[in-house]
Amino acid sequence: MAAAALQLRQSLCPGPRVLRTFSSVASPAAPRAGPRTASRSERPMRRKALPPRTEKMDTDQDWPSVYPTAAPFKPSAVPLPVRMGYPVKKGVPMAKEGNLELLKIPNFLHLTPVAIKRHCAALKDFCTEWPAALDSDEKCEEHFPVEIDTADYVSSGPSIRNPKARAVTLRVKLSSLNLDNHAKKKLIKLVGERYCKATDVLTITTDRCPLKRQNYDYAVYLLTVLYHESWKTEDWENSKTEEDMDEYVWAKSSSENSVLQTLLQMRAAESSVAPSREELLGTKEVEDYQKCVVRLKNEGENEASLAQYKESVKRLLNLA
């Protein structure tokens, strides 16, 4: 039985068996190809830096074409050995190349005499002679009552813009506007502290819009709205009494009616012809009495106002 099994095994594996040995030493890996180093002749040539623009400039070049408008300092466009900065260890101040101090301050390289002359020549066609009739400030204020104030700023920085430059101030005297007594009082009530009673000047300042032109249009719009609103009369304004008035008005008041009735009775007793209402209001005694009463009501009582009121009553009643 064992001999038969051995013969069968030999028939299945006819060749001799070879035992494989195990080793702890790893076989060396195949060498990898490293990066190929190009030779100096095969390397691309670096592009040389171009010389500064200032070295190519001619001495008789057109400078307004180089610096046409206001702009930060450009070292490559200014052929001047400009230096600025604090010298380190008593050395030479910093040159213009890469100097941030020159960028902080404003420059006027665009305002050369030649550039200013060209600007004046270009604007000359749009300029007219000053009107001969406007030979005084009073006439200018009469024909041009609205005054517009704006401001331009020069900032120390790379930007030539300033947010404060967009503010616009409009000034106008209320006496130059076509306003009656009611419209003037209502406009003063609407504007509040923007009106100066001592100078009779209304001041409107606008700075909400990002552009100066927009703020100018907004200021003119506000003035237009205030003017038209002041002329409107609401229903509740007609029902106001003397106690509701912000300022005492003598016309059509109880004081005026009392004075007229008293004077009419006195004149009727003296003569048979009674004067008219307009004649009594036009006399000097009634006008002085009116001024004293208005001053006493609006400004309050004091020794001077009471003394003036006393004298006006004496003259009105022929007691002086």
Curated annotation (Swiss-Prot):
Any one GO MF annotation of this record: structural constituent of ribosome
Subcellular location: Mitochondrion
Domain of life per record: Eukaryota
Keyword Ribonucleoprotein attributed: yes
InterPro entries: Ribosomal_mS35_mit, Ribosomal_mS35_mt
GO cellular component annotations of the record: mitochondrial inner membrane; mitochondrial small ribosomal subunit; mitochondrion
Keywords: Mitochondrion, Ribonucleoprotein, Ribosomal protein, Transit peptide
Pfam family, one: MRP-S28
Region (Disordered) location: 24-63
Keyword Transport part of the UniProt annotation: no
Example GO biological process: mitochondrial translation
Family: Belongs to the mitochondrion-specific ribosomal protein mS35 family.
Subunit structure: Component of the mitochondrial ribosome small subunit (28S) which comprises a 12S rRNA and about 30 distinct proteins.
Name of this protein: Small ribosomal subunit protein mS35
Taxonomic lineage from the root: Eukaryota, Metazoa, Chordata, Craniata, Vertebrata
